[in-house]
Structures are given as C-alpha cells and as structure tokens.
From Swiss-Prot:
This is Large ribosomal subunit protein uL29. One of its GO terms (cellular component) is cytosolic large ribosomal subunit. Gene3D superfamilies: 1.10.287.310. One of its GO terms (biological process) is translation. SUPFAM superfamilies: Ribosomal protein L29 (L29p) (SSF46561). Belongs to the universal ribosomal protein uL29 family. It comes from the Bacteria. The gene is rpmC. It comes from Ligilactobacillus salivarius (strain UCC118). Keywords: Ribonucleoprotein, Ribosomal protein. HAMAP family: Ribosomal_uL29. InterPro entries: Ribosomal_protein_uL29, Ribosomal_uL29, Ribosomal_uL29_CS, Ribosomal_uL29_sf.
Amino acid sequence: MKAKEINELTTAEMLEKEKQFKEELFNLRFQLATGQLENTARLKEVRKNIARIKTALRQQELNK
C-alpha cells in the first residue's frame, strides 16, 4: 500500500487497515516460527505498511 493511497483514507479506515495489518503480521510470525512461511519479504511489507499508516495518522493529528 502506497503512502498516497493511505493519505486518501479517512481516520477510521486507517485504524481499520492498521488492525488488519497487525493481525496479518501476527499470523505471518506464526508461520515463520513453524516453518510454513514461503514469502518472507511479506513480513517487511506489512511492517512498513503499519509504519506508513501510523505516520499518516500522526500527521493528521498534528495538522488539526
């Protein structure tokens, strides 16, 4: 998910996306621990998406 796409979301949508990404990260970590994870790069993608969302939320908070 690109930063531009994230900035177009509402605050509620951002929070929902963050929750979804955190759940996905949790599941990916379990798959990694059990040796079932094939695409390890997905871990990095999800972590970066969470960071992008948190950054956008903070920017909105500071702009108010």
